[in-house]
Design a protein with these regions (language model features):
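Short, Lys/Arg-enriched N-terminal segments with co-localized hydrophobic residues
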Residues: 3-18
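C-terminal substrate-binding/catalytic lobe of Rossmann-fold NAD(P)-dependent oxidoreductases
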Residues: 22, 33-34, 41-74, 170-308
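Glycine-rich Rossmann-fold phosphate-binding loop(s) that bind the pyrophosphate
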Residues: 28
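Rossmann-fold NAD(P) dinucleotide-binding segment
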Residues: 74-77, 91-110
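N-terminal Rossmann-like NAD(P) cofactor-binding module of classical short-chain dehydrogenase/reductase
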Residues: 83-87, 108
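Rossmann-fold NAD(P)-binding glycine/threonine-rich loop
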Residues: 111-135
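Oxidoreductase and adenylate-handling cofactor-binding alpha/beta cores
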Residues: 145-161, 176-186, 310
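NAD(P)-dependent Rossmann-like dehydrogenase/reductase catalytic/cofactor-binding core
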Residues: 285-346
Length: 346
């Protein structure tokens, strides 16, 4: 029924009519499927096409009216979609794909390698400006919603301390690292905030916390037959950049237990700023923002789709180049008019 409504959907605001925002998805993994589901909940949008590196005949999507095409066919859709959402990985896909496709489409990505965001921004900005397109990068919850809350909190409380805690939730990157270990058949890793550290921040103690003091890691590992459990546990706990700096617990479980008890991809976390105001800094304040997510990729996708609306609107205004969540006014995200927002949410 929703897709029938979308086919007929014309929004009228102050006498102006416009059709649905036509979305393309590049990459159909967990994030791509999440974007497809999110589009279904936004009646001013329609999914037009999914681009895949796989054989299109092997890709089964949920939207009956959308097409599945090879990535090599993307250029043929240059004038058929309004925004292309890039759902690849940050390690190797997005650094290449986002600048490339910003020369053809208005684009949105979820690039999350924090240290490389300035470089990625510059590359996308150059490509988008040359093509007269608009790109929004690093959209999601961290970077994304957490970033916005850090910025707001720092602007409001210029004297203070920032804290970010992640979890409890599945870290897909750390889970991948576990699965790369010889003898590991499958695995999930949870990042867990240290409750005493979180409470110290909430109490206004402004603690100086090490990596180990902020989070613990819990691993659920399925072994290949005959694998050396002691060796694997030691290798996990000593793995640099992933587990060596944390108190890590390793559980060896069956494949069935992993699938039934750890089949989801939950996540979340906290962004806090503890600060002071007053002539003599006599008053303390705490700003806390929390996310608790059943599905990390589906929530990330929902944020991305809201920013796809912003990309469409900014492009319609003639804006070009790259943007981040810092650069975009909140009203651009909403399907509601400014008049309605002021009447109902302000």
């Amino acid at each position: 029924m929703l897709h029938l409504l979308r086919d007929l959907f014309i929004i009228k605001r102050k006498g102006e009519s416009f059709m649905s925002i036509r979305i393309g998805i590049l990459g159909y993994g967990n994030l791509g499927r999440g974007v497809e589901c999110a589009i279904r909940q936004n009646l001013d949008m329609e999914l037009a096409v999914v681009f895949t590196r796989r054989n299109p005949e092997d890709v089964r999507i949920l939207t009956e009216t959308a097409k599945v095409c090879r990535v090599s066919e993307a250029e043929q859709w240059k004038d058929k979609i309004d925004v292309l959402i890039l759902c690849g990985g940050s390690a190797t896909d997005l650094p290449v794909q986002t600048p490339k496709y910003a020369s053809l489409f208005n684009v949105v990505d979820s690039f999350d390698t924090h240290a490389r965001i300035p470089e990625h921004f510059a590359n996308v900005d150059e490509a988008a400006k040359q093509a007269g397109k608009l790109g929004i990068i690093s959209v999601g919850w961290d970077p994304g919603m957490f970033s916005l809350n850090r910025m707001y909190a720092n602007a409001i409380l210029p004297e203070g301390s920032d804290y970010t805690f992640w979890g409890k939730g599945v870290s897909q990157g750390h889970s991948d690292a576990l699965r790369r270990i010889e003898g590991v058949k499958n695995a999930k890793q949870y990042t867990i905030p240290v409750e005493s550290a979180l409470e110290a921040v909430r109490a206004g103690e402004n603690p100086v916390l090490t990596t180990r003091q902020k989070h613990t890691r819990e691993c659920f590992v399925v072994l290949e037959e005959g694998a050396d459990a002691a060796r694997i546990e030691k290798e996990i706990k000593e793995m640099p950049n992933y587990f060596a700096d944390y108190d890590t617990t390793v559980h060896f479980i069956s494949e069935e237990e992993l699938l039934t008890q750890h089949g989801g991809i939950p996540h979340g976390g906290f962004v806090l700023r503890s600060g002071v105001t007053g002539w003599n800094r006599e008053n303390r304040h705490l700003i806390e923002y929390r996310l608790k997510l059943d599905s990390n990729p589906e929530f990330t996708s929902s944020v991305i789709v809201a920013y796809a609306r912003a990309a469409y609107r900014l492009a319609k205004e003639g804006q070009t180049g790259c943007r981040t969540v810092f650069d975009i006014a909140p009203a651009y995200l909403s399907p509601t008019t400014g008049e309605e927002l002021r009447a109902t949410m302000l």
